[in-house]
């Protein structure tokens, strides 16, 4: 079955959703090699693929949609920027980046998805009631806050090294800092950016885990 897929140049749609049927054997690991591509359509992978090794090389790579609904482990490598506008994974996926390039995932991570960032700038969005650890690693990362994490199930947000920014609406920030719960669930975030700063709210920075900008 298909075990390696390379995409370069400008494209629209790549459907590898039947790769497990190409031969009798079924591949559960796929190497997706991106080499300076801009894809405006969906890149759809077989649900039998449980481990996706995604390498971003040559130049910046952008996928409008990556559908890897079977993937429980997604490993991002490479030295070029990667943009995933919409990424659909297994609901309990573990995404690990060791990339030195910037990694941007525009769509919100599902509540049960864990994320570990690399040395580059990670730009991600969480969702409310996240049950897993989200850590962006080194670099000046940006996390858009989707809502309170579930601390009962070890949900957390860790900005890691660098000067890291959390983006919230004013209402989210006011609610989050009204108690000490938010501060207990986040760490290593240095900058609070309000996406709607004109909206007047009272924010208690003493409950913001030391965020000071």
Where are these predicted regions, by residue range?
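Solvent-exposed, low-complexity segments and loops of surface/extracellular structural proteins
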Residues: 1-213
């Amino acid at each position: 079955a298909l075990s390696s897929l390379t995409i370069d140049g400008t494209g629209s749609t790549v459907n590898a959703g039947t790769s497990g049927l190409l031969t009798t054997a079924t591949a559960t690991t796929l190497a997706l090699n991106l080499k300076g591509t801009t894809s405006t359509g969906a890149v759809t992978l077989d649900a039998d693929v449980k481990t996706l090794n995604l390498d971003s090389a040559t130049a910046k790579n952008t996928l409008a949609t990556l559908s890897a609904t079977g993937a429980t482990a997604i490993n991002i490598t490479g030295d070029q920027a990667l943009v995933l506008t919409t990424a659909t994974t297994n609901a309990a996926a573990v995404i690990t980046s060791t990339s030195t390039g910037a990694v941007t995932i525009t769509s919100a991570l599902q509540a049960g998805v864990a994320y570990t960032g690399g040395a580059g700038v990670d730009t991600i969005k969480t969702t409310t009631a996240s049950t897993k650890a989200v850590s962006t690693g080194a670099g000046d990362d940006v996390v858009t806050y989707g809502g309170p994490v579930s601390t009962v199930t070890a949900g957390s947000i860790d900005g890691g090294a660098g000067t890291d920014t959390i983006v919230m609406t004013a209402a989210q920030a006011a609610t989050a800092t009204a108690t000490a719960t938010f501060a207990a669930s986040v760490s290593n975030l240095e900058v609070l950016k309000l996406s709607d700063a004109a909206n007047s709210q009272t924010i208690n920075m003493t409950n913001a885990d030391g965020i000071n900008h």
